[in-house]
Amino acid sequence: MAYAYRRTIHLADTDAAGVVYFAQLLHICHEAYEICLIGNGMDWSGLLREGTVALPIVHSAIDFLRPITWGDRLDIQLYPELENSRQFKISYRIFKENQDSPPESPLATALTRHVAINPRTRQRCSLPPVVETWLRNAPKIEDSKI
C-alpha cells in the first residue's frame, strides 16, 4: 500500500483555463512528500539544522492524463525508491478521491528525483542513514510505468 496524502484543489491552484496549473501539481506532490516524511517520524528540521545534507530535486516530470479542476479532492499516492547510496526517486500517482470504491485510473502521474549533497561544498554525498532506512522500508510501486 502506498503512502497517501489527500488534498483539495483550491482556486489558486488553477490557471485561466480552470485546470490545475502544472507547476502547482508538482508543488502539491512535494507537499505530499513533506507530510510523508513527518508522518514516518523523520526529524527533517533536525537534519536541516545540522547542515550536513540537502536533498535537492534534480529531475521532475509530470503527465496529465485527465483534467484536474477546482474543488477536486485528490488522493496522492507516493512510492519512494532508493536508486543508489546518493540518490532516490519518488513516483506519484494522483487519483480523484472516491471513498466508496477502488480508485479509477490516475488523473496524473509524476516523478521527482533527489540527490544527497553536502550543502557547504555542493558535492554529492551519501544519503543519511535515516533516509536510506525510510527508502528501504517504503512501499513498492506495483507498476513501474512512471
Swiss-Prot record:
Its EC number is 3.1.2.28. Keywords: Hydrolase. This is 1,4-dihydroxy-2-naphthoyl-CoA hydrolase. Belongs to the 4-hydroxybenzoyl-CoA thioesterase family. DHNA-CoA hydrolase subfamily. Catalyzes the hydrolysis of 1,4-dihydroxy-2-naphthoyl-CoA (DHNA-CoA) to 1,4-dihydroxy-2-naphthoate (DHNA), a reaction involved in phylloquinone (vitamin K1) biosynthesis. The keyword Hydrolase applies. InterPro entries: DHNA_CoA_hydrolase, HotDog_dom_sf. GO terms for biological process: phylloquinone biosynthetic process. The active site is at D15. GO terms for molecular function: 1,4-dihydroxy-2-naphthoyl-CoA thioesterase activity. It catalyses: 1,4-dihydroxy-2-naphthoyl-CoA + H2O = 1,4-dihydroxy-2-naphthoate + CoA + H(+). Gene3D superfamilies: Hotdog Thioesterase. It comes from the Bacteria. Pathway: Cofactor biosynthesis; phylloquinone biosynthesis; Quinol/quinone metabolism; 1,4-dihydroxy-2-naphthoate biosynthesis; 1,4-dihydroxy-2-naphthoate from chorismate: step 7/7. It is an enzyme of class 3 (hydrolase). The keyword Lipid biosynthesis does not apply. Pfam families: 4HBT_2. It comes from Picosynechococcus sp. (strain ATCC 27264 / PCC 7002 / PR-6).
